[in-house]
Amino acid sequence: MTLTGINQLWVADIPYVRLKGEFVYLAVILDSFSRKVVGWAVDRTMMSHRLTVAALERAVADRQPQAGLVHHSDRGLQYASPEYVAALDKYGMVASMSRPANPYDNASWESFMKTLKQEEIYTNRYNDLEQLRTNIEEFIEEYYNRQRLHSALGYRSPEEFEQQSERKQPANSRGATVQFTVNDENEKQASTWITGEGDSNAVPFPRPQPF
């Protein structure tokens, strides 16, 4: 699939995060063109459609995509639920799910998860859901999308990359190819990537210190 701009391919997944005494779930939607996080939500359960729909609604409110956007996910029940499928239909999105013989290339998602682990999750101990929500919002909205440089984007942040792409190049003049490859292990491990006791290589992002 060749991407020529934003809001053509969104990739969604649900990792889980360890809190003090419990696990909670983080639904994230990533724009594959710019690697920008366009929607996210956290909740104590992923057994209903509430978590995933909340992330989707947030993404739609922020991006206002046109019909025809491809929404890719694994085959989890949360993304296959009637409520979530109805939400995709409501916004004219094309649902795409990984199959045993043809999972999607997870390069942009893996890159985001690695950054989230090393620069946020593994450098903090969260006491409760509200603390996690506050930290995740600050990490995504203030740092990752606006400041974090990506080698794949020419050492630009997702927002800078989007702005320069829109300003300097027509939407149909820039092509970026997303290669679909077989990698069953990525799908199997999708909900375990950001758990753990910590990592010796973890480096926190430069969160502003309170006065």
Regions found by a protein language model. Give the residues of each.
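Charged DNA-binding/catalytic regions of mobile-element recombinases
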Residues: M1-F211
